[in-house]
Amino acid sequence: WGEKIFVTQPLEKEQERALLCIDRLDGKILWQRSVKYTEQERSHRTNPYCSESPATDGKRVIAVYGSAGVVCYDLKGKLLWKRDLGKIDFEWGAAASPVIHGDLVYIYRGPDPKAHLIALDKRTGKTIWQANDPAVSIDDRTDVFRRNKSREWIGSFSTPIIVTAKG
């Protein structure tokens, strides 16, 4: 945003998930904030922790850290709010980035047996609504899990997008 770049990074030795603010012109780290998370979390070797890209609206930056939660900082690194949204239990780990639109931040939490899309107030972190993924039978599936005997998972690995539907 402007001259700032925001990235997430796992600090595995420290057992932390970090958000870095980097100066776009010289590459210097302007600030770094991290969240401690010591519990074991499943993830794929090609999908390390902190795969989600942070999102900003120019006033705040929001980072999602899978099971380690969601954090919101102002652009100077002051913590505005933090939420624990529960654990994600999926063999490839979390990967969907948050999307800010209007006063809401949308976060997809899946694929997972409890997968859902959640909308939070970007100013407070309060849940505005949540839509749970429906259970799907194997015959209805079109994803790579078709051979999986689980009937509860829908495979979706992408970040939500905002579209206008029916008008």
Regions found by a protein language model. Name each.
Residues 1-167:
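Noncatalytic, solvent-exposed loop/strand surfaces
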